[in-house]
Amino acid sequence: MENFKHLPEPFRIRVIEPVKRTTREYREKAILNAGMNPFLLDSEDVFIDLLTDSGTGAITQEMQAAMFRGDEAYSGSRSYHALARAVKDIFGYEYTIPTHQGRGAEQIYIPVLIKKREKEKGLDRSKMVALSNYFFDTTQGHTQINCCVAKNVYTEEAFDTGVKADFKGNFDLEKLEQAILEAGPANVPYIVSTITCNSAGGQPVSIANLKAVYEIAQRYDIPVIMDSARFAENAYFIQQRERDYRNWSIEEITREAYKYADGLAMSAKKDAMVQMGGLLCFKDESFFDVYTECRTLCLVQEGFPTYGGLEGGAMERLAVGLYDGMRQDWLAYRINQVEYLVNGLEAIGVICQQAGGHAAFVDAGKLLPHIPADQFPAHALACELYKVAGIRAVEIGSLLLGRDPATGKQHPCPAELLRLTIPRATYTQTHMDFIIEAFEKVKANARNVKGLEFTYEPPVLRHFTARLKEKA
């Protein structure tokens, strides 16, 4: 199938879900009733749902078949052992705890690592600083509710939509080491390597960067956790862009990358393709004590450590999905679909972040320059896009970033982005063309889009349940 301009989807569609078409008047009422927050819309009122790729896509026939192998034993399930074997084979990690999703893993390992630092070093957690190339929102939230500061140390070009670079998700290594020294190494309970870097636009992190981060962390005795939601997409970018790995398979690159962390936390609802599931895993016996404490916390918060909130069939499906998500042809199709959308948007003058792995990120600050950051231009754009075309997208900007817990002031945001997240094997090229046409209509009316203000602001993860109204 070489030398074709566009390759079709590498699958056949066997089951479909009808969606309803709505009028502009209907959608205006719906978004108003939802408090100008797309998260609060009913899914039946959404024509194309680009809110997230987390558990919203299709699954493979092999994953569906695996459900019927499920062992629903409360403890010692053979389905757990199938999952643990897959983790060992793919990542090389010895110890596996299943969780209901990614934040289930976070609510276990984060307090354990912070408490471990307190106990061993006799430190005050309020002085601790956790570091990342960019924390995902729930990872940041769990860090903050455990009284620890979450700090991002990304590269200068990460959020510059005018710059193209192979690995815009990389850590700034100089800033990382500086942040460690400023906080004091003992006050850094963990470093999170987020691959791909969602908040920067699904941008990849190179193996060279992961290795350098791990070397710095080991020098200062700081554990590294890999936020692994999109591990396969990151491996694909490494294969395509990092010279030393161009002839490596996705499986080989994945195994190599995970040498440079001590543990992984995963929302398996992304690259592992399941509707529900997560993982918390540790590499070897050097983290056995942490693993043991995490198992205990899992008992309290998720369930017995050999099911962790998942039924046996779901663990079987996850074990298969980890492999299916690494298929070379599948990843090529998925990355090219995102690139097609980004290229189409830029062709009509809509500025985007460089095409990443799972979504197109529109620079809302440039499309709506008349709306200041504290009136949430990307969220305003999301509301307008829904009104125009029934498309639901999500803000990655000031609304998501939130306030400084100590001062209550809005965190400065490096970019105001609207994320158009593409669920796996769900939408076709025709859908991408419709999205591009919708943006033509939005762009033509951009100057009339209004900023937003709160009518209800939750204290944590406010973007999920906040209610807003248009500024007068």
Swiss-Prot record:
Catalysed reactions listed for this entry: L-tryptophan + H2O = indole + pyruvate + NH4(+)
InterPro entries documented for this protein: ArAA_b-elim_lyase/Thr_aldolase, Beta-eliminating_lyase, PyrdxlP-dep_Trfase, PyrdxlP-dep_Trfase_major, PyrdxlP-dep_Trfase_small, TNase, Tryptophanase_CS
Cofactors that this protein relies on: pyridoxal 5'-phosphate
Keyword Lyase: yes
Pathway this chain belongs to: Amino-acid degradation; L-tryptophan degradation via pyruvate pathway; indole and pyruvate from L-tryptophan: step 1/1
UniProt keyword terms in alphabetical order: Lyase, Pyridoxal phosphate, Tryptophan catabolism
Chain positions found as N6-(pyridoxal phosphate)lysine: K270
GO molecular function: tryptophanase activity
Enzyme Commission designation: 4.1.99.1
Record-linked Pfam families: Beta_elim_lyase
Subunit note: Homotetramer.
Assigned protein family: Belongs to the beta-eliminating lyase family.
Protein name: Tryptophanase
